[in-house]
């Protein structure tokens, strides 16, 4: 029973994202790539917060920083980023391409 309780925070994580205006306000810096093959994470923007369960690239953009799990800043150059993302058209296409970067969204 102890193990289940300890693991729940990892499974209950959702990706509610807030885009900040300055790099110093962010938890991570993100660059949007032109091609899926260049990305660490394929992201699908969902319409409701309840759809953003898990660390699977399903992002819900919130209106206020206090509602978010992570604050991101979109950078202009790939070299400035912590994470490279590619926006996909379908929910089923979302997910990690580079598992070594998963820790950034926990």
Language model: regions and residue ranges:
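Sec-dependent N-terminal signal peptides
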Residues: 1-12
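Repetitive, compositionally biased segments used for assembly/scaffolding
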Residues: 14-106
């Amino acid at each position: 029973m102890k193990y289940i309780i300890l693991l729940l925070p990892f499974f209950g994580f959702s990706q509610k994202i807030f885009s900040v205006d300055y790099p110093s306000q962010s938890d991570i810096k993100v660059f949007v790539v032109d091609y899926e093959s260049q990305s660490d994470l394929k992201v699908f923007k969902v319409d409701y917060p309840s759809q953003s369960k898990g660390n699977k690239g399903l992002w819900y953009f919130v209106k206020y920083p206090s509602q978010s799990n992570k604050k991101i800043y979109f950078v202009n150059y790939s070299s400035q980023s912590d994470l490279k993302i590619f926006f996909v058209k379908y929910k089923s296409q979302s997910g990690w391409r580079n598992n070594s970067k998963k820790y950034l969204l926990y």
